[in-house]
Curated annotation (Swiss-Prot):
Pfam family membership, one: AA_kinase
Organism: Janthinobacterium sp. (strain Marseille) (Minibacterium massiliensis)
Family: Belongs to the acetylglutamate kinase family. ArgB subfamily.
PANTHER family per the UniProt record, alphabetical: N-ACETYLGLUTAMATE SYNTHASE, N-ACETYLGLUTAMATE SYNTHASE, MITOCHONDRIAL
Name of the protein this chain belongs to: Acetylglutamate kinase
Residues noted as binding substrate in the record, renumbered to the chain: G70, G71, R92, N194
Length: 297
């Protein structure tokens, strides 16, 4: 289905809207948490389409909450100061200098770009970091050393979430704003921590009792070792894929967070291809199934 209403006939436009009606009714008043990342954040056409999609969800009565990443933008900023990004088990090693770059890029450049685009198209977006309203309290991550059981790797200012205070997000939702959250947490001493955006999105969805968690990525969904798309995954199947190495690298925190959200009561969890224009609307407002659904059982 072509979701761009500017290039189809009035009859097809009416058909699309009619198909969306049951979903608009079903999800009216519900919270939809979207992890926004990948090409959808870097390609101009997709960026503008995403902004319009989020506004439409808000206008028809849903409560979208956006948690954004920014890995490519951080890498580009680090290159400008002669640093190379390094990852362990899908997590970015974050020394003091890198943490300063992460704060500036995520909480400044990337977040403001999203906010300005949504506001440009008539929405009301407000940017938040974990420090705002005490939204994300974090502590230094203790990452197990897989090669030395019982020991831990020091990966710098990478954080684990200790607590989420949803009050500021709920207040914005009640006032018709769209929260745009940067995945930066803060410790009790004020230290900033870099937190994986997938982890933040999953925990936000859990705390807000979201109807849906949608993770946008650069692939069609979760794939097996032969590259075949897996449209539906249970907790047991995911555990097996962790064990045999099918899921690795940056997909580790993504799938773990998706599964945790499903187990914690988020009704539906999907990993979708953000390279498809209007993929967010297709997921929420049509019968068209694509990507991978994560199930807790």
């Amino acid at each position: 289905m072509n979701a761009d209403l500017t290039v189809v006939s009035p009859q097809i436009q009416a058909q699309i809207l009619a198909e969306a009606l049951p979903y608009i009714r079903k999800f009216h008043g519900k919270t939809i948490v979207v992890k926004y990342g990948g090409n959808a954040m870097t390609e101009e056409r997709l960026k503008h389409g995403f902004a319009r999609d989020v506004i439409l969800l808000k206008l028809v009565g849903m409560n979208p909450v956006v948690v954004h990443g920014g890995g490519p933008q951080i890498d580009n900023a680090l290159k400008k100061i002669g640093k190379q990004g390094t990852f362990v088990q899908g997590m970015r090693i974050t020394d003091e200098e890198t943490m300063e770059v992460v704060e500036w890029v995520l909480g400044g450049e990337v977040q403001q770009d999203i906010v300005m685009l949504i506001n440009h198209y008539g929405g009301q977006a407000v940017g938040l970091t974990g420090k705002d309203g005490g939204l994300i309290r974090a502590k230094k991550m203790q990452m197990p050393d897989k090669e030395h059981p019982g020991q831990f790797l020091d990966i710098g200012f990478v954080g684990d979430i200790e607590a989420i205070n949803p009050a500021v997000v709920k207040a914005l939702q009640d006032d018709a704003f769209i929260p745009i959250i940067s995945p930066i947490g803060f410790g009790d001493d004020g230290q900033a921590y870099n937190i994986n955006a997938d982890v933040v999105a999953g925990k936000i969805a859990e705390i807000l009792k979201a109807e849906k968690l949608i993770m946008m990525t650069n692939i069609a969904g979760v794939q097996d070792k032969q590259g075949n798309l897996l449209t539906d995954l249970s907790a047991r199947e995911i555990d097996e894929m962790f064990e045999d190495g099918t899921i690795s690298g940056g997909m580790l925190p993504k799938i773990s967070s998706a599964l945790d959200a499903a187990k914690s009561g988020v009704n539906t969890v999907h990993i979708i291809d953000g390279r498809i224009e209007h993929s967010l609307l297709l997921e929420v407002l049509t019968e068209q199934a694509f990507g991978t659904m994560i199930r807790s059982h």
